[in-house]
Amino acid sequence: MSAPDLKRAAAERAIPLVEDGMRLGIGTGSTAAAFIALLGERVRAGLTVTGVPTSEATRIACEREGIPLATLEELPELDLTIDGADEVDGNLRLIKGGGAALLREKIVAAASRRMVVIADASKRVETLGAFPLPVEVNLFGIGATTRAVEAAVAAAGCIGEIVRRLDKAGQPVLTDGGHALLDLRLGRIPDPEALSARLWAVPGVVEHGLFLGIADAAILAAAEGDQAVVSVLGRL
């Protein structure tokens, strides 16, 4: 069973959580894309929802599927957010931001009564950090900010390298908000809360990809033979 099949299986389990009339935060990334496609089918079948997208890419995908959209200014309180994750541990702590939408994703999730993660089971880890941790930073003073982030990482007991994210053409990636991304290749984050606090203390850091105390549940799809087996971490 392929990774896209598993992502679709996780998304299928999340679809029944969406009720008529909901105000829905809609995530970014390949698993969220599977959810958007299924949600579009439900909308065309008569489901009434209003979505708030977490990125321009998600906005375009939702519009293509005919999903009604609003901004967070228009709908400042959401019922549910469905989004993917790059890593999730047993305490529902996440690393997100591989799709460069971490700031908007965190704002939308924080505005929601509930956040449910959908992912294939390979994203489930014992300790966060194998996936590079994204840190969104202001372009002004990026050199000084990078040095301060390096010091924060060391003070939090982490070891690794920090690189600026580049696109496939070798150009620096900019977020939808016009900020740069640093990827922290740490391998292991022994104390995510400590690292989060250290990063927040750095002037120039706009947001980081540690989502702590935000997710309520994670739907994880694993392959067993040619079947997808879906498990739930937390409470749906």
Swiss-Prot record:
GO biological process, one term: pentose-phosphate shunt, non-oxidative branch
CDD domains found in the cross-reference section: RPI_A
Catalytic residue positions: E105
Catalytic activity annotation: aldehydo-D-ribose 5-phosphate = D-ribulose 5-phosphate
Molecular-function GO terms, alphabetical: ribose-5-phosphate isomerase activity
Domain of life: Bacteria
Residues annotated as binding substrate: T28, G29, S30, T31, D83, G84, A85, D86, K96, G97, G98, G99, K123
Transmembrane among keywords: no
The keyword Mitochondrion belongs to this UniProt entry's keyword annotation: no
Pathway(s): Carbohydrate degradation; pentose phosphate pathway; D-ribose 5-phosphate from D-ribulose 5-phosphate (non-oxidative stage): step 1/1
HAMAP family: Rib_5P_isom_A
Known role: Catalyzes the reversible conversion of ribose-5-phosphate to ribulose 5-phosphate.
Protein's name according to its UniProt entry: Ribose-5-phosphate isomerase A
Gene source species: Methylorubrum populi (strain ATCC BAA-705 / NCIMB 13946 / BJ001)
Encoding gene (name): rpiA
